[in-house]
Swiss-Prot record:
Annotated PANTHER family: EUKARYOTIC TRANSLATION INITIATION FACTOR 2C
Protein name (database record): Protein argonaute-4
Domain Piwi as annotated: residue spans: 509-820
GO MF annotations, alphabetized: double-stranded RNA binding; miRNA binding; RNA endonuclease activity; single-stranded RNA binding
Annotated compartments: Cytoplasm, P-body
Signal sequence region: none
Gene of this entry: AGO4
Subunit field text: Interacts with EIF4B, IMP8, PRMT5, TNRC6A and TNRC6B. Interacts with ZFP36.
Naturally occurring in which organism (per UniProt): Homo sapiens (Human)
Coiled-coil zones: none
Function field: Required for RNA-mediated gene silencing (RNAi). Binds to short RNAs such as microRNAs (miRNAs) and represses the translation of mRNAs which are complementary to them. Lacks endonuclease activity and does not appear to cleave target mRNAs. Also required for RNA-directed transcription and replication of the human hapatitis delta virus (HDV).
Region Disordered: start-end pairs: 825-846
Amino acid sequence: MEALGPGPPASLFQPPRRPGLGTVGKPIRLLANHFQVQIPKIDVYHYDVDIKPEKRPRRVNREVVDTMVRHFKMQIFGDRQPGYDGKRNMYTAHPLPIGRDRVDMEVTLPGEGKDQTFKVSVQWVSVVSLQLLLEALAGHLNEVPDDSVQALDVITRHLPSMRYTPVGRSFFSPPEGYYHPLGGGREVWFGFHQSVRPAMWNMMLNIDVSATAFYRAQPIIEFMCEVLDIQNINEQTKPLTDSQRVKFTKEIRGLKVEVTHCGQMKRKYRVCNVTRRPASHQTFPLQLENGQAMECTVAQYFKQKYSLQLKYPHLPCLQVGQEQKHTYLPLEVCNIVAGQRCIKKLTDNQTSTMIKATARSAPDRQEEISRLVKSNSMVGGPDPYLKEFGIVVHNEMTELTGRVLPAPMLQYGGRNKTVATPNQGVWDMRGKQFYAGIEIKVWAVACFAPQKQCREDLLKSFTDQLRKISKDAGMPIQGQPCFCKYAQGADSVEPMFKHLKMTYVGLQLIVVILPGKTPVYAEVKRVGDTLLGMATQCVQVKNVVKTSPQTLSNLCLKINAKLGGINNVLVPHQRPSVFQQPVIFLGADVTHPPAGDGKKPSIAAVVGSMDGHPSRYCATVRVQTSRQEISQELLYSQEVIQDLTNMVRELLIQFYKSTRFKPTRIIYYRGGVSEGQMKQVAWPELIAIRKACISLEEDYRPGITYIVVQKRHHTRLFCADKTERVGKSGNVPAGTTVDSTITHPSEFDFYLCSHAGIQGTSRPSHYQVLWDDNCFTADELQLLTYQLCHTYVRCTRSVSIPAPAYYARLVAFRARYHLVDKDHDSAEGSHVSGQSNGRDPQALAKAVQIHHDTQHTMYFA
């Protein structure tokens, strides 16, 4: 076992090599949306491109380089078609006749109103060998050369980047022949994802259809009406109210608008604010001929300067450009600039509309991807840039053989100790009792739904049915609730819960009935989890009014887990050999606030198993240092869990208290890391885990296996044989595993689709092993991972990632609710600067600190 010192920088960090291929399971023929890329054994030439003025959007840079290549054809470029990435990297198939010298050129683009001149300098950087890349793909080299992969990526993206609107690794074009409004001035654009990936023996182009939300190009007045639900602008005869203005500001701040009152000169501006005063009252200092300044209203100015009588002088203005410059534009002369992606979080309704518009059954998606590639619509005829470099992309999906792993059997308890065998990722609890059910003697009900919506007889019927089902499940709720009252609003949660805790000794559970989406939920969890240490179970009023055995049974799954029960366990004899010695499973995740929400911090969560099954878990959670305080080169450390040593230490101590064993192995499943950051994150985290062990005992060195779990990727698997498709959506069966053909040429990774796809196309999870002291075989790790997907307490189905990784997400997500500030967040003030509601790091840390009575329970279930 290697000792981990402070060790090499991430760049030298070498993940373990693949220990061979898995063999367990029933073979299945599959197709993957990876398309083989043939590359010649040539060198390509890498040049640095420096464009002044800097900080122009990539779109402009591309135009500059495109113009430069045409303009300096005779002197420099000849017939070469360079690939360019929109920033500083350019690649050619043949060297430019400039040697190693820097060449300076001047390029003019026709601008809006006046032409723009750019100074461009080009200088040789290096020769990039595709021959080396081919050797790496054949498994002859330890590492895949990044520079060759980058060169290929830039070359294959060059044409689509000129032709479409790039977003990350995807390309979108404006809607033609379809229109999917999302409301609030947003609409769906369809496009495709493309990325080159090294695979066994070949480079692959991963191509997928994708969709995202864009802002509709429309007049700002219409945009405002959509955002504020104003049916007809003529009804809005008064100025906006404060709350309307705040809501409108939140949506429009940061967007680009273009003006319509200057004829062809459609100048573009970025919105920084919305004025409090209407255009008829908003003033600014107007410079007069004589050098003096006089206060002038925006409405007056537009009348004098443009002879434009404003139609809506009572509406506010947009403040654009830099805040200190006081540039104001009336709403009615502005349009939203086309092609702006929506990075703000979609509302619940928008998300559901989006899913309806974009979900495709697996066969439909397969058909759509094939059509896209074959029609060459992604390249609109043969791509001259690919041709230049002698690159050929095959237009058939890659065929491969996967395996369907056997599902584990699950042990239940009660008198008859039944065993459930999952079928297609699903099993049933009917006729079975929990492995260890909790007896509930003292419990309370608090109904926050109004009495007219949820009458007393409905409440009574609900509690009776819940008691019956709980008894069947082996978690008997004995007797009527000791307390059952109606309440209103988040403010009544704390006094009511305090009263309950003081009055009823041994109170085990509070069932809370909620009227739909409400701030009461966050408050119930804050008070229950962090303030008083009480178990709470929320239920939506619609599920009380219309009860189903399924819903009640699912409630019991959650309640039993929260109270320390065990729903079921993996049948011991079928578990992999890692269970022969004490082992702890850790799940870790970092969740970031939605884009455009710089005020909120990132949250890191780590959970650890607390028994040998593994079924019970304990959680630790921390607020990460805010992003502003981190310098640019350390930005990836935002992803690193900052207090990991202490978190793991707590979990190891707790494991020892629970089991009286010290784990000899630590299996760490890490979610929430993007591909580009894996190695930078893994190294410091491995050292932190090691430190946690050594801090307990100098020579305590359990073997660590570090696995990154990724769901956010574009690999999709399809059944080659139609008869193997499963369910309405025609997906691959649960348990489908792939560790060859489309996986890494030498590293230890695999795809596993552990869940039964219900809607749309299943997305297999990707697992990448970055460290392994425990010398897992492919079969052992794949089976272990699949079995852990069956141990998630909230449902009787296999889920898409292992339970520990899933729990870490739940814990981080719950901490978001603990951070909701009753006084600020619900009111949504207009512009709160700095960190989360101006609360300091200590206050944030305290807000997510779980009460000691709750700390060692699965409160997050």
